[in-house]
Structure formats: structure tokens, C-alpha cells
């Protein structure tokens, strides 16, 4: 009897302990499920409120049958997972064990680890290069990390270069067509001129669109070539990083001074071009204003030069003619005067030639006395010749006349 009562009391205590354990286990399971659901919703971008606790325990067999590590398939009656769990918690069944609770917690931990691993993989795709681990203390590990870092920097630089080139091409393309539109707006006759020159007015729009598409195709082709060149450089850098880095650095070091020199030359040429163009326009403008007066002045000056030259030549010819005529006339007059002159003394009987002596005649001037002596009265030893310069025809005529007059005098 006492043994029976003892068994009954033990059974009651075991039932009370079992019910308390079931309630506690159900609470743990519900909290774990709600935490798991909240984590999944947060990863998906939504957050669901926590469900309220239920007092009824979950049947152990049905919960064990439904809860697994794998995802639960949809049921035939169309009920979702949460409603099934709620129904299972409201039913009365056997107690849930601690092993099942641990399985649920392990499932939650496994799911969280999988989600974290997916996030790490996504980050590694965006940033493929990882910093070296603290354990990689050898020189080769640091060198490998340095090479990877250089590759990443060069890859980013290549992408930025291609992006800047594309932006520059787009800007130039936009500026070109804006300038064309403004020119057509400011100078409407340009469109008519182009249409009359290259075709009908209806086809000018088609021609502009064709040129625009052609320019776009050239721009795309050039951008593709640039991208292909950058890719080739990147692949060469992966294969031979030192040689490629040396070539790129040498090319950059050569391109920079060449670009500066080219820029200076272009700037200087452009400056002088505008200076010469301005001077040409100014000189052309003023010459067009004063072309008629300048031509008139030059014509008058040419007429004056020709007139003065003609008058000078004529005056020289007239003076020469007058001088020659006067010289001839004076010569004739002197000849006549010499013929009409009579001797002032009578002739005496002549002495022999051997006894004759040259006697000076004071009536004859001294120059003529020295030169005008008849050769039959004097000898060669007694004749004294002095240089007499005949500067003109008048002097020569005077000398001739004096010679003729001297021959008629009898020198004693």
C-alpha cells in the first residue's frame, strides 16, 4: 500500500516536472524561431514584429517531424510554415526534448553563418585583393601582396583613364554640335550656302545626321581602340610587371615634355597668326581707304619726274647747240680780223739768213712772242716752247689767229 502511494506521488511529481519542462522548452523553441525569422527578414531588407508567446506546449512528434535543417516544402493544403508551427504549438502532445532545441539552435547558427559567408563573398567580389594575413611574415608573401596591390592600383588607374577619355570625347562632341547650332542661329545664310553648295535644302538635314552618325561611329571606334590598348597594357603588366611599368613610365616621361613643347609651339604659332591676321586686316582697311589718294600722289610724282628729266635733257641739248654755234661764229670772226690786219712797219732789205738774229718785238704779247715766231727767221735752237693749254675751241682759234698774224711780222 505504501509502495503504491509512493509510486502515485512519484508519477504526479514526474508529470508536474514534465509539464514545466515542456513549457520551458516551448518557450525556448519559440524564441529561437522568432530570432531566426527576424535575422532572415533583416537580411532581406524587412523586419517583422515578434509573435506573442503561447502557453500550450508543442507536440514533440509533430514538431520533430516538421522541424529539420533543410528548408520545409509547401504542403498540400496551402498553409505556410508559420501557421503550421503555430498550430503545432497549440496542440497537446508529448514533451519536447533538449536535443531538439539544440538542433534548432544549431540550424539558426548554421543559417547565420551561411548568410555571413555570402556577404563576405559579395565583398570579396567588389574588393578582390585582400590584405596580407598577419601570419604571412616571409618576404615572398609581402612581395606577392605588393605585386597584387600594384596590379589593383594600375587597374583602377586604367579604368579612370578610360572613363576620363570617354567623358572628354563626349564633351568635345557636345561642344562641336553646340557651336554648329549657334553658328546656324547667328548666321542663317550659312545653312543656305551649305545647302546650295552640297545639295538641296531638304537633304541638308539628312547630310547633317549622316555626318553626326559618322562622327559618333568614329568616336566609338577611337574609344574602343583606347580601351583595347589599356587592356593590352594591363595584361602585359600582369605578365611582366617590371618591364611594363618601365615602358609606361618612360612613355609618360617622354610624352610630358613633348606635349609641353607642342603646346608652346601651337600657342606661339596661334599668337603670331592672330598678330599677322590683325596687321593684314588693318593695313588692308587703311589701304582701301587711301588707295585713290595714294595712287593720285604717286601718279603726279611720276609725271613730275618724267617732266623734269625731259626738261633737263632739252636744256642740255640747247646749251650744247648754242655753245657749238657761238664757237664756230667766233672762229670765223677772228679769222676775218686776222686777214684784215696790216703790218705796222715797212719791210727793209733782208739780210742773209746766216746773219739774222731773233729780236724781241715789244708790240707782241709775251705768250704769243714765245710761240708765234716764224720758222724761216729763227733756228731750232733759238725757239723756246712753253706748254699752253687749249681748254676750248675759242682758245684754239685765238692761237691759230695769232700764228697767222705772227707770220706777217718781220722780226729783226
From Swiss-Prot:
Biased composition (Polar residues): 357-373
Chain residue ranges for the region called Disordered: 347-374
Cellular localisation: Endoplasmic reticulum membrane; Lipid droplet
Residues in compartment: Lumenal: 192-247, 293
Keyword Mitochondrion: no
Entry keywords, A to Z: Endoplasmic reticulum, Lipid droplet, Membrane, Transmembrane, Transmembrane helix
Induction: Levels gradually but drastically drop as cells approach stationary phase (at protein level).
Keyword Transmembrane listed: yes
InterPro entries, A to Z: Osw5
A Pfam short name: Promethin
Membrane-crossing segments per the record: 171-191, 248-268, 272-292, 294-314
Cysteine pairings via disulfide bonds: none
Membrane-topology descriptor: Multi-pass membrane protein
GO cellular component annotations of the record: cell periphery; endoplasmic reticulum membrane; lipid droplet
Domain of life of the organism encoding this protein: Eukaryota
Cytoplasmic side of membrane: 1-170, 269-271, 315-412
Signal sequence region: none
An example Gene Ontology biological process: lipid droplet organization
Record GO terms (molecular function): protein-containing complex binding
Oligomer status and interactors: Interacts specifically with the seipin complex FLD1-LDB16. Only a fraction appears to associate with the seipin core components, suggesting that it may be an ancillary subunit of the complex.
Function: Involved in lipid droplet (LD) organization. Modulates triglyceride (TAG) storage by reducing DGA1 LD localization. Promotes LD targeting of some proteins, including PDR16.
Official protein name in the record: Lipid droplet organization protein LDO45
Native species: Saccharomyces cerevisiae (strain ATCC 204508 / S288c) (Baker's yeast)
Source species taxonomy: Eukaryota, Fungi, Dikarya, Ascomycota, Saccharomycotina
Gene (UniProt): LDO45
Amino acid at each position: 500500500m505504501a509502495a503504491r502511494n509512493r509510486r502515485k506521488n512519484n508519477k504526479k511529481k514526474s508529470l508536474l516536472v514534465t509539464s514545466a519542462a515542456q513549457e520551458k522548452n516551448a518557450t525556448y523553441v519559440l524564441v529561437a524561431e522568432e530570432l531566426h525569422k527576424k535575422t532572415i527578414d533583416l537580411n532581406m531588407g524587412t523586419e517583422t514584429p515578434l509573435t506573442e508567446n503561447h502557453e500550450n506546449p508543442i507536440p514533440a512528434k509533430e514538431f520533430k517531424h516538421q522541424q529539420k535543417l533543410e528548408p520545409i516544402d509547401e504542403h498540400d493544403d496551402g498553409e505556410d510554415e508559420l501557421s503550421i508551427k503555430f498550430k503545432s504549438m497549440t496542440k497537446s502532445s508529448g514533451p519536447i526534448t533538449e536535443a531538439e532545441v539544440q538542433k534548432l539552435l544549431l540550424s539558426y547558427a548554421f543559417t547565420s553563418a551561411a548568410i555571413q559567408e555570402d556577404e563576405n563573398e559579395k565583398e570579396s567580389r567588389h574588393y578582390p585583393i585582400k590584405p596580407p594575413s598577419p601570419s604571412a611574415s616571409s618576404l615572398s608573401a609581402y612581395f606577392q601582396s605588393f605585386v597584387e596591390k600594384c596590379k589593383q592600383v594600375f587597374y583602377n588607374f586604367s579604368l579612370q583613364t578610360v572613363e576620363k577619355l570617354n567623358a572628354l570625347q563626349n564633351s568635345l562632341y557636345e561642344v562641336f554640335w553646340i557651336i554648329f547650332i549657334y553658328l546656324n542661329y547667328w548666321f542663317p545664310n550659312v545653312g543656305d550656302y551649305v545647302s546650295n553648295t552640297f545639295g538641296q535644302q531638304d537633304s541638308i538635314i539628312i547630310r547633317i545626321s549622316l555626318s553626326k552618325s559618322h562622327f559618333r561611329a568614329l568616336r566609338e571606334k577611337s574609344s574602343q581602340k583606347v580601351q583595347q590598348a589599356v587592356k593590352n597594357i594591363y595584361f602585359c603588366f600582369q605578365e611582366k610587371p617590371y618591364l611594363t611599368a618601365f615602358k609606361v613610365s618612360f612613355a609618360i616621361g617622354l610624352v610630358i615634355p613633348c606635349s609641353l613643347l607642342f603646346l608652346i609651339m601651337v600657342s606661339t604659332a596661334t599668337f603670331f597668326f592672330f598678330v599677322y591676321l590683325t596687321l593684314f586686316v588693318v593695313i588692308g582697311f587703311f589701304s582701301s581707304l587711301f588707295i585713290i589718294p595714294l595712287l593720285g600722289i604717286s601718279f603726279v610724282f611720276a609725271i613730275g619726274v618724267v617732266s623734269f628729266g625731259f626738261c633737263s635733257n632739252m636744256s642740255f641739248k640747247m646749251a650744247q647747240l648754242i655753245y657749238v654755234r657761238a664757237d664756230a661764229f667766233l672762229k670765223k670772226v677772228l679769222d676775218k680780223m686776222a686777214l684784215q690786219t696790216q703790218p705796222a712797219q715797212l719791210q727793209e732789205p733782208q739780210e742773209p739768213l746766216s746773219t739774222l738774229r731773233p729780236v724781241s718785238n715789244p708790240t707782241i704779247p709775251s705768250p704769243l712772242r714765245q710761240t708765234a715766231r716764224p720758222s724761216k727767221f729763227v733756228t731750232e735752237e733759238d725757239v723756246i716752247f712753253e706748254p699752253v693749254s687749249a681748254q676750248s675751241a675759242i682758245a684754239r682759234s685765238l692761237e691759230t689767229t695769232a700764228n697767222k698774224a705772227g707770220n706777217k711780222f718781220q722780226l729783226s
